[in-house]
Amino acid sequence: MKIKNLEEALICFKENAIIHGECTQNGDYKRGNKSHKNIINAIKYISAEHKYEILEPLLEDNNLSVRIWAAYALLHVNTPKAVKALKEIVKNDSGIMGVNAEMTLDEFKKGNI
């Protein structure tokens, strides 16, 4: 998907974060890998425009996958907010999304993100 502006980047990010979460739940790795690529492309576009702040409202989105991906994208830009969002997910979700949030925090602490 070719992103042309910030609005498209945000839509692409959110839609694909939702898809990625669904694929994580149901094991559809092919579709999940495609959505992952689209999320990363959206993050790269947003980064190139220096507009990470458009992702901050997504830290409170109803969809856990959207929140996790927003936190991932913001870990080096707004570390306190991103870490807080991930910790809340770990605390409140005992399923795969909680595990994903915990792994994201662990990898960040190790310096791998």
Regions found by a protein language model. Name each.
Residues 62-63, 93-94:
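Short inter-helical turns and helix N-cap capping residues of alpha-solenoid HEAT/ARM repeat scaffolds
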Residues 3-11, 23, 46-59, 79-91, ...:
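Amphipathic alpha-helical scaffolding segments comprising HEAT/armadillo-like alpha-solenoid repeats
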Residues 89-93, 106-108:
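Short, intrinsically disordered/low-complexity patches at protein termini
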Residues 64-88:
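Charged low-complexity stretches with an acidic bias
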Residues 18-21:
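Alpha-helical repeat scaffolds in large eukaryotic proteins
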Residues 2-4, 11-15, 26-47, 68-77, ...:
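Structural detector for internal amphipathic alpha-helices that build alpha-solenoid repeat scaffolds
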